[in-house]
UniProtKB/Swiss-Prot annotation:
Pfam families: Chal_sti_synt_C (PF02797), Chal_sti_synt_N (PF00195)
Example of a GO MF term: naringenin-chalcone synthase activity
UniProt cross-references to PANTHER family, sorted A to Z: CHALCONE SYNTHASE, HYDROXYMETHYLGLUTARYL-COA SYNTHASE
Protein name: Chalcone synthase C
Organism domain of life: Eukaryota
Metabolic or biological pathway: Secondary metabolite biosynthesis; flavonoid biosynthesis
Length: 352
């Protein structure tokens, strides 16, 4: 497992002379599908649409998982009509990768476009000034990729520099900020459009008595996209910086590659999450923070603004308790989880 830490600020300075060329976030945009599900009634819908209502005890177990998730609702591309047209999506083991791909290759960039357009509108500059596009998704794989499709949808210049990142999982939101920081700071005058777009159709399937991890995936993930525009030296009166990207770091915890896995199979993207993941994060979070913040002389974890990926309520509770955080420190992360579920890469860029 990898932990990515990105330090954003509009007030902090280093001990040494401040570097004026730090990248800034100039705009943020988000988007969600219009269709949404109520978490309290979702177990009834899920077991009915997957023809699994005979699994009464398993359904009640799923209901308990949903009730404990602290998720109120999730927005989904999935509708009853879509699932009835594609029944192979509703069983656990049916070969359905082609069906999923056919839907995702259009839905992922389309949802990404909505977030990107909102970010561009907030930025207030011509779209022709975008020099780089970085796109990320764990929903589907295609070539030409979702970055190419999004560039066409937006009408970006044919000379825009594109980078496509597939299958980076929940870690990707912070990683994308790190990449955007590097691109902006090494390309004077560049403006980097970052887009994360996720559609949980890739992991949707019926229940399996042998794979309880699947129930967690069906309870947890939602659909959404987020976009930010990053650049250096904002032009006074023309651009308004929201955050400064001061530093970015990534730490991989040794011998943890089996704890959290998503694997692309004929049946789609399968999900495995060890029950030890929340405690693993809790045990290692402070060491990661010390390495990231020590150069800035910061050791009081309540003195900083938090954007923690809401991978699940147990993770948020564990980090809060381990670090002695005041309740409001993780309020934004809890609000995103409650209103949208786990949006994978888009979560840390989302506004509750």
């Amino acid at each position: 497992m990898s932990t990515a830490v990105t330090i954003l600020t509009d007030t902090w300075t280093r001990r040494e002379k401040r570097f004026d060329g730090h990248a800034k976030i100039l705009a943020i945009g988000t988007a969600i599908p219009a269709n949404w599900v109520d978490q309290t009634t979702y177990p009834d819908f899920y077991f009915r649409i997957t023809n699994s209502e005979h699994l009464l005890e398993y359904k009640e177990k799923f209901r308990r998982i949903c009730n404990k998730s602290k998720i109120r609702k999730r927005h989904l591309v999935i509708t009853e009509e879509l699932l009835k047209k594609n029944p192979n999506l509703c069983t656990y083991n049916d070969a359905s990768l082609n069906t999923r791909q056919d839907i995702l290759v259009s839905e992922v960039p389309k949802l990404g476009k909505e977030a990107a357009m909102k970010a561009i509108k907030e930025w207030g500059r011509p779209i022709s000034e975008i020099t780089h596009l970085v796109f990320c998704t764990s929903s589907g794989v295609d070539m030409p990729g979702a970055d190419f499709q999004l560039a066409k949808l937006l009408g970006l210049s044919s000379s825009v520099n594109r980078l496509m990142m597939y299958q980076q999982g929940c870690n990707a939101g912070a990683v994308m900020l790190r990449l955007a920081k590097d691109l902006a700071e090494n390309n004077k005058g560049g403006r980097v459009l970052v887009v994360c777009s996720e559609v949980m159709l890739s992991v949707f399937r019926g229940p399996s008595l042998q794979q309880e991890d699947n129930l967690l995936a069906q309870c947890l993930f939602g659909d959404g996209s987020a976009a930010v525009i990053v650049g250096t030296e904002p032009r006074p009166g023309l651009e308004t910086p929201l955050f400064e990207l001061v530093s970015a770091a990534q730490t991989t915890i040794p011998d943890t590659d089996s704890y959290l896995k998503l694997q692309l199979r004929e049946m789609g993207l399968t999900f495995h999450c060890s029950k030890a993941v929340p405690s693993l994060i809790t045990q290692n979070i402070e060491d990661c923070l010390v390495k990231a913040f020590e150069p800035f002389g910061i050791s009081d974890w309540n003195s900083i603004f938090w954007i923690l990926h809401p991978g699940g309520n147990a993770i948020l509770d564990g980090v809060e308790e381990k670090l002695g955080l005041e309740p409001e420190k993780l309020r934004a992360s809890r609000d995103v989880l409650s209103q949208y579920g786990n949006l994978t890469s888009a979560c840390v860029l989302f506004k509750p």
